[in-house]
């Protein structure tokens, strides 16, 4: 914490931390909200330093915070609360989190360190707080999902309920990289995938993996393809051959899907959207996943997750790609050409954590591919901004 206005204690004095620790000896219900908030940002609400009574009081305080409306966020405000008649605001501006509150008729502010900010985020209630374009978080909680749904669906549900954003600046820097590996990436993924590990959707309609495999084969994507090659678009006859080999020709039930895929597979922007979603550099490496997990465990998060080392979880990785057609209102080039733009969301969900549940790291990239984008290294490089990646962590308790 760079300043210490929320207490009378000096940040740089060695007595500051001892004072924080000594507050556990004070009757908890006599502590001011400032003292409680100070303990939360110092240790986190799930710290083993806290007793159950203290955690209850901390949770009660944090439950008072609500997401701020968009019109309230001129200075980056993302949460607010009114506690004991005192207005408190949490703001994030240029990557720095500040706590604002009224002290009499004066507004006091405190800037939080990175660790204090993370402690604060992990202590927020399970509501969605918008922290700007890059970070939209749901406060992390452990969940028990009793369902007979397939594992990928359970994982996706849990991810949406139990996530914590991890800063990505140290792990994702693609400003100086190209897409030279993209053709090999999609070839390896599709060749190795089965229906349980990779799912591809267009406007919520699942695209069969065999259909995608036949498509990339017809496009000339194989293990020997030149990484610099610009893909040549398929003719109607080529696409029609792929469609007819995957759908019964006389079955009218598939007529809508056949017409849809026939149109999509001749659109260079769709091919760009599809192939770019497999680019390996969009996703975190396994070593970074292990490093992040070690950091989480070292900060006593295992206390919240009921960490049990003797129970193992088999490693698994699911790849979910969602492509939606969009027509931006203000893009005259798109409307004039009559083409379509595509919004892509590519998520990898590796489970590899040792615990009494399933640990998930969600690595997600979302970006827009404009109409007419050519499926080439240059076209893809221009389509995907480096700031679009985010990593989140979740725990799922097994169905018992």
UniProtKB/Swiss-Prot annotation:
User: What EC number(s) is this enzyme filed under?
Assistant: 3.4.22.-
| UniProt key word Nucleus | no
Going by the UniProt record, its keywords in alphabetical order are: Hydrolase, Plasmid, Protease, Secreted, Thiol protease, Virulence
Write out the GO MF terms.
cysteine-type endopeptidase activity
| Keyword Amino-acid biosynthesis attributed | no
- Where are the active-site residues found? 34
Gene Ontology biological process terms, A to Z: proteolysis
Q: Where is this region: Tubulin-binding domain?
A: 224-315
EC class of the enzyme, as a word: hydrolase
GO CC terms, sorted: extracellular region
UniProt-annotated location(s): Secreted
* InterPro entries to which the protein is assigned, alphabetical: Cys_protease_VirA/EspG (IPR009669), Cys_protease_VirA/EspG_N (IPR043098)
Q: Where this protein primarily resides, as one coarse class?
A: secreted
Assembly behavior? Monomer. Interacts specifically with alpha tubulin, a major component of microtubule.
Q: What does this protein do?
A: Alpha-tubulin-specific protease that is required for entry into epithelial cells and for subsequent intra- and intercellular spreading. Contributes to bacterial entry into epithelial cells by inducing microtubule (MT) destabilization and the formation of membrane ruffles. The membrane ruffling evoked by VirA results from the activation of host rac1, which is associated with the destruction of MT networks. Creates a tunnel inside the host cell cytoplasm by breaking down the microtubule infrastructure.
Family from the record: Belongs to the protease EspG/VirA family.
- Please report the name of this protein according to its UniProt entry: Cysteine protease-like VirA
Its source organism is Shigella dysenteriae serotype 1 (strain Sd197)
Q: List the gene name.
A: virA
């Amino acid at each position: 914490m760079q300043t210490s206005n929320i207490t009378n204690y000096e940040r740089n004095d060695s007595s500051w931390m001892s004072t924080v620790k000594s507050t556990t000896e004070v009757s908890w219900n006599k502590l001011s909200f400032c003292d409680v908030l100070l303990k939360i940002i110092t240790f986190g609400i799930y710290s083993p330093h806290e007793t159950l009574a203290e955690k209850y009081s901390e949770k009660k305080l944090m439950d008072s915070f609500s997401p701020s409306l968009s019109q309230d966020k001129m200075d980056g405000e993302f949460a607010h609360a009114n506690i004991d008649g005192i207005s408190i605001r949490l703001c994030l501006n240029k990557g720095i989190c500040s706590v604002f509150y009224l002290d009499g008729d004066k507004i006091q502010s405190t800037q939080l360190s990175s660790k204090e900010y993370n402690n604060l985020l992990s202590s927020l209630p399970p509501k969605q707080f918008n922290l700007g374009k890059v970070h939209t978080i749901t406060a992390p909680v452990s969940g028990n999902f009793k369902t007979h749904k397939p594992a990928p669906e359970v994982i996706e549900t849990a991810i949406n309920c139990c996530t914590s954003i991890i800063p990505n600046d140290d792990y994702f820097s693609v400003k100086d990289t190209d897409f030279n590996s993209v053709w090999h990436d999609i070839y390896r993924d599709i060749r190795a995938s089965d229906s349980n590990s990779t799912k591809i959707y267009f406007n919520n309609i699942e695209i069969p993996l065999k259909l995608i495999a036949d498509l990339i084969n017809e496009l000339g994507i194989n293990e020997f393809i030149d990484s610099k090659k610009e893909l040549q678009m398929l003719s109607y006859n080529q696409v029609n051959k792929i469609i007819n080999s995957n759908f019964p020709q006389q079955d009218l039930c598939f007529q809508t899907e056949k017409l849809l895929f026939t149109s999509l597979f001749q659109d260079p922007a769709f091919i760009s959207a599809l192939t770019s979603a497999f680019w390996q550099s969009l996703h975190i490496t396994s070593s970074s996943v292990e490093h992040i997990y070690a950091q989480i465990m070292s900060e006593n998060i295992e206390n919240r997750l009921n960490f049990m080392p003797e129970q193992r979880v088999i490693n698994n990785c699911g790849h979910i790609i969602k492509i939606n057609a969009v027509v931006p209102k203000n893009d005259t080039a798109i409307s004039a050409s009559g083409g379509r733009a595509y919004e892509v969301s590519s998520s990898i969900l590796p489970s590899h954590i040792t615990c009494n549940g399933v640990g998930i790291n969600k690595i997600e990239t979302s970006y827009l591919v404009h109409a007419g984008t050519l499926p080439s290294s240059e076209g893809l490089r221009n389509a995907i901004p480096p700031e679009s990646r985010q990593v989140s962590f979740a725990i799922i308790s097994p169905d018992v």
